[in-house]
Every structure is written in structure tokens, then in C-alpha cells.
Amino acid sequence: NKKVNLEQFRKSILYPLHEDGFDPYREEFNSMMDSNLEAGENNFSAIKLISFGKSDQTPKLAYRSLSQIGEYFKSGLSEIEASFNLLTGEERANHLADMLRGENHLPFTYQDLVRSGQTTKHFIAPPSLSFKHKNHIEIDNRLLQVVYVRDYGMELGDKFIRDLIQSDLEVMMSLHAKGSAKSEAMKKLRTKKTLMESQKIGEQQKMARSGVYLEKVSQVLESNIDEADELLKTMTQTGDKLFDTLFLIGVFADTEDQLNQSLDIVKQVAGSNDLIIDNLTYMQEAAFNSLLPFGKNYLEGVSRSLLTSNIAVNSPWTSVDIQDKGGKFYGINQISSNIITIDRGKLNTPSGLILGTSGSGKGM
């Protein structure tokens, strides 16, 4: 979720004046769009990427598996009319440069790489990166702090991602999910459950020697045993798999005060969605690498096991904004409050039909 140059966006959608007698209408239209820009969320642009990783015996087999996974995702998410494009190497490099350097970089091409004799890292990496602070990173003259979702509520939904995107914060979110074979996951769960039950019996025997007889011991231990039971039951009945999951949030700011204020907003949004955010103290470098869309998690010991259904609902595709570059104003997205701009000249059939109730503004 990155900031866009609002003035450039205005210039791309407002009607230029031509002094041909129709300028009052253009000015009225421009004034209406200007007020919608101020009321909407067009000062931020959300870019959504999916990265897949696959280990196999040979690169050829791994590439074949990746292609199958990509087509599977594309087919599944097409049901909610979310369109996908496979990124080229140049496009991936430019997206990474946008994330790390903002607008302060030239467009990357492989021809430039050949001429310069440099690597893609020279085009992507910012002039300076400092990891000397325990809780944040310095990127040029800006700050970035990476935090993670430590605890999840009983019910998960897509509202947290939607609220965070609409909170007027410059953030990067990364959701890692690494699956395992169902039989292996259930075996591990049963082993953990057995160990916890053995621990429970041990504590009961210890209390019995002291003359205390209780059916239940530690509340946390009892809760963990019940949770393991529920997971096994759900996996057996629904066919869900278990995934090692890590939800990271990177917050950008210009000063430490702004960073703290932004983090407070993130924690408030998380709290309203029954989630708990925690810092990654002295782990910012590994967290930074995990935040980038490489499809690899470099952090250890902070992941959480979630079921397929829990992960599937965390979708960033809650609405689709139609904003063609150089397009004209066609209304307001009722979900995101962003304006809709369409360049009908790019369509196979640029003709259109305007429908609406009486007095709804069809004449405009």
C-alpha cells in the first residue's frame, strides 16, 4: 500500500481547459472529481503479488510444478473475478525497486544490465540500508519497522487486511504459508497431544503427592489439548491441511514519532479484529528479507500453524478498482470510495450505455 503522487493523478484524470465555450462544464466536472479525490483513498495505491516457491529434484521439475500451482491459483481466484498477470524478470525488478527506492529510480531493463555490467541488485537496492536499531530499519532517509501477528482470534476474516489498506498508512504486508503432507501434519499433532497429556498426568501426580486432587490442571495446558483435539477433528472431517503461517506487516514513516503513531494505528486495527501484533526485536534484517515478495521466510520460531480455511479467508481482493491511465471519470466505487476512470478507447467496442434512475445524473 504505497503513496501515489496525487498531483500527477489529478492531471491524468482532470479535463484540460480549451477556451472553446465549454470550459464552465469542464470546470464543474473537475471540481466534482477533485472533491471525490479528497474524500476517497486515491492517495494510496495497493499492489498485490503472489509468490510461489517449490523444491524439487531438478529445476525443470520445479518449474513444471510451479506452473501447475500458478494455473491452479489463477483458476480458483478467477471465480471472484480477480485477474492475474505473470510478471517478467524486468517487472519483478521494477516492483522491488518501487518498494525500496520509491520513485527515485530509472525503469529497469535487461539491456541496461548488459550495457552497465552490473547486477539486478544495483538497480533494486536503495543507496543505504542500516540495521543498527533493534526495532526498525533505516532505508535512505526513511524508517521501516516490521512487526508480525502473534496471536489470532477464534474467527479469521478478510476485514483486517481491508481495514489496514484503508487506514491511510504506507505499509507492506506479507503472508507466508508453507504446507505439509496431511498425514505428516496429523502425526505431529497426535505426538504433540500425547506429550501434552503426559505432561498433564505428571502434574496431576505431583499435586496428588501433595494431597491435592484435580481433574484439570493448568488452564493453558488444557486449552492447548482442546485445541489439538479440535484441529485433528477438523482435519479429519473437512480435509483441511495444516500450514506454517507467518503474517508480517512493514510500516514506513519519515520520523520515529510518525512511525510510533502508525504502529499504534496498526495495533488498534489488529485489536478490533481480535489479533495481537508484536515486535521483532533484533530480528529486523531477517524480517525485512521475509517481507519482500521472494516467497521465502527467513524468520524462525515465530510461525503459527493454521488450517487451509483460516488462510483462505485472508484475501486482499475485497474489491477491484478500475482506474485506467488517462481514463475519464465514470463514478465512485461503493466499497473503496475510490473514483472509477475508464479509457473506452482501449476497449474492443468503445461504445457505452448509461443506465440510472430518474435524477441520478445520467445527463452528466
What residue spans do the PLM features occupy?
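Extended, folded cores of ATP/NTP-driven motor/assembly subunits in large transport
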Residues: 1-316
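Pre-P-loop entry segment of helicase/translocase ATPase cores
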Residues: 303-332, 336
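Glycine-rich phosphate-binding loop of nucleotide-binding enzymes
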Residues: 325-364
